[in-house]
């Protein structure tokens, strides 16, 4: 839980400080990475970013649950557990105890940092977690253009690319996770390797899709901006959440106007 994780950070901080490091290797990069890495914190605390129909953000994006989550992140910097600026290879060099990253990081470390004693931990959940799904999902997607002249063939290709055999090949060639249970279960590594086994367990048991909304790009960018502005530049979290609602609403107008 959040409170348990905070206690762990307190204990490891003196150790990594001797190496001129931090307890956490944690950044808020632009693009899709930030919402992918940190949405689980919001979800496990009972928060979300848009309404179920994807057309409302006021009272959702700026909810009290989301404010609590942002303030929890702020406590990391306030207590010196993370750096205000990105430090290259902080975790990989042994100067950070924890790193938030995608499943692909396991393969990166196996190949490039074989001396790192890597362990995958479950996502940290809120003390208010109700046991629901909270782990981020999603990767490559395949689709046919609405203007394709070969719809039947394109449909078959998308079906194959989204299926078992394609998933197994994607894993073998690129280490991108499959999208079907059968593909996972046909690859022994997801049982034999403890880190990949832990990742599969998280995905299969707690996988949570990101928000479905016509203004998803604005939602994703706003999550990144709120965390960067609130945590790294110490702006008021509630003000930043409310500003994001205004920005997203400006884009939502075209979809909700009658």
PLM features per residue range, with description:
Residues 114, 121-122, 172-229, 254-257:
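Long, aromatic- and glycine/proline-rich binding clefts that accommodate carbohydrate-like moieties
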Residues 6-11, 53-84:
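Glycine-centered hinge/linker elements that transmit conformational signals in sensory
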Residues 3-58, 96:
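Extracytoplasmic/periplasmic solute-binding protein
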Residues 97-102, 119-121:
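Paired acidic/hydrophobic, glycine-rich loop segments that form the ligand-binding mouth/hinge
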Residues 7-11, 85-99, 225, 229-232:
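Short helices/loops that flank or line small-molecule/ion binding pockets
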Residues 6-9, 91, 237-249:
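Short, well-structured alpha-helical segments that form the helix of a local strand-helix-strand
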Residues 14-30, 83, 163-174, 250-258:
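Bilobed periplasmic-binding protein-like "clamshell/Venus-flytrap" ligand-binding domains
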Residues 64-67, 71, 78-82, 111-176, ...:
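Extracytoplasmic/periplasmic substrate-recognition and gating elements
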